[in-house]
């Protein structure tokens, strides 16, 4: 008996695997540190706006997220007409791929780039080409070497998840200058709000001065609205127009839009989260290093910790040990980093408990 067959290449796509849900020994407090969620939750103003929207759930949203686009425009000094909003930046990435990729096309990503990139690329029949990284960091020359006449998109998470590394803005500009004009450079800035380096820029300036660069952002991380699925992109008017033609007519909900407006306006909440992240990122990196572990320098709200390969001391062993203590980190086998764990920077209590547990783990015979 025949049955429906997916389009070519769909079954070759590895499903996205999110950070695991908390499971621990009975009676033990659990800390989920596997999905890079903020330990502070959203702004109280965002929560109030979300609850206030419940009075009119019978109404459709304004289809273009106008109020949110205007709030983003005010916050960043951008033209709202060049902003498109989506159900998380994931939807934006998929819309980009759906608009500009097809069979015979190629998109480039780096070795340890975000796992949504291959999904978005291959779902549209295109081929994902991998550019090797150098020291777990994007190598601009490696990307440029992979460009072919079939290249249509370059995916660049800056800073990158899961490594936490970033590309200085001068290198991003060099990348843009080296790409053909028909190639769109996608600068995924999901973690941009956490970066405090003087040589870093999210890329908005490039969008303003070129016709082939876009920047995507999310409200899921520092703004704490992951459950609402809300994100945005700033790009050239013609790219935004093309994407709007295939965007779902009511793709972002009223509660999500209003909560995001309140979140972006609460700069004090953002600054508090940023300061906490910087303090504990430095502390965690130092403490793990004291335990003999290698930590990849991070500018994000997480750290990448590398474990030995000796039996009983591996990342998988550490993951099992920590999970039993109610400390849930992210294993990275599906990223090709089986010897590392990614830890979201949590509350002071959670951070200290993880270091204590890792010390106990490393002290085992």
UniProtKB/Swiss-Prot annotation:
- Under Enzyme Commission nomenclature, its number is 2.6.1.9
Tell me which residues bear N6-(pyridoxal phosphate)lysine: 221
Question: Under the GO molecular function aspect, what terms does this record hold?
Answer: histidinol-phosphate transaminase activity; pyridoxal phosphate binding
Q: Which reaction does it catalyse?
A: L-histidinol phosphate + 2-oxoglutarate = 3-(imidazol-4-yl)-2-oxopropyl phosphate + L-glutamate
For this UniProt record, the keywords arranged alphabetically read as follows: Amino-acid biosynthesis, Aminotransferase, Histidine biosynthesis, Pyridoxal phosphate, Transferase
Q: Where is this region: Disordered?
A: 1-23
Give an example GO biological process: L-histidine biosynthetic process
What pathway annotation does it carry? Answer: Amino-acid biosynthesis; L-histidine biosynthesis; L-histidine from 5-phospho-alpha-D-ribose 1-diphosphate: step 7/9
Do the record's keywords include Cytoplasm?
no
Q: Which cofactor does it need?
A: pyridoxal 5'-phosphate
Return the broad EC class: transferase
Q: Which Gene3D superfamilies match?
A: Aspartate Aminotransferase, domain 1, Type I PLP-dependent aspartate aminotransferase-like (Major domain)
The family database entries (Pfam families) matched by this protein are listed as:
Aminotran_1_2
Q: Assembly state and interactors? A: Homodimer.
State the family it belongs to: Belongs to the class-II pyridoxal-phosphate-dependent aminotransferase family. Histidinol-phosphate aminotransferase subfamily.
Q: Which PANTHER family match?
A: HISTIDINOL-PHOSPHATE AMINOTRANSFERASE, HISTIDINOL-PHOSPHATE AMINOTRANSFERASE 2
Which protein is depicted?
Histidinol-phosphate aminotransferase
- Tell me what organism the protein belongs to: Rhodopseudomonas palustris (strain BisB18)
């Amino acid at each position: 008996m025949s049955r429906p067959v997916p389009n070519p290449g769909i079954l070759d796509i590895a499903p996205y695997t999110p950070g695991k849900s908390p499971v621990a020994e009975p009676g033990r407090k659990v800390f989920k540190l596997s999905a890079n969620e903020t330990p502070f939750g959203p702004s109280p103003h965002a929560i109030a706006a979300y609850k206030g929207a419940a009075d009119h759930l019978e109404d459709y949203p304004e289809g273009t997220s106008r109020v949110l686009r205007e709030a983003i425009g005010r916050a960043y000094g951008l033209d709202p007409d060049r902003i498109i909003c989506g159900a998380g930046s994931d939807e934006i990435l998929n819309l980009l791929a759906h608009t500009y990729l097809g069979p015979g096309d190629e998109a480039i990503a780096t070795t340890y780039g975000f796992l949504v990139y291959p999904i978005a690329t291959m779902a549209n029949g295109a081929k994902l080409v991998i550019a090797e990284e150098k020291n777990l960091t994007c190598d601009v020359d490696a990307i440029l070497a992979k460009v072919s006449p079939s290249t249509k998109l370059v995916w660049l998470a800056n800073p990158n998840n899961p490594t936490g590394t970033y590309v200085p803005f001068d290198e991003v500009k060099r990348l843009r200058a080296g790409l053909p004009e028909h190639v769109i450079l996608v600068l995924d800035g999901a973690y941009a709000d956490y970066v405090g380096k003087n040589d870093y820029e999210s890329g908005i300036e490039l969008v303003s001065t070129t016709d082939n660069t876009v920047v995507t952002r999310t409200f899921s991380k520092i703004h704490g609205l992951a459950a609402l699925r809300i994100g945005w992109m700033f790009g050239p008017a013609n790219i935004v127009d093309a994407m709007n033609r295939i965007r779902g007519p009511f793709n972002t909900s009223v509660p999500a839009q209003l909560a995001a407006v309140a979140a972006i306006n609460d700069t004090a909440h953002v600054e508090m989260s940023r300061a906490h992240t910087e303090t504990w990122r430095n502390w965690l990196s130092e403490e793990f290093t004291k335990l003999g572990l290698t930590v990849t320098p991070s500018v994000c709200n997480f750290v990448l910790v590398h474990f030995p390969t000796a039996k009983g001391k591996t990342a998988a062993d550490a993951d099992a040990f920590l999970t039993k203590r109610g400390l849930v980190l992210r294993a990275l086998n599906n990223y090709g980093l089986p010897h590392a764990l990614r830890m979201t920077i949590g509350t002071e209590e959670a951070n200290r408990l993880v270091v204590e547990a890792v010390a106990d783990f490393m002290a085992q015979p």
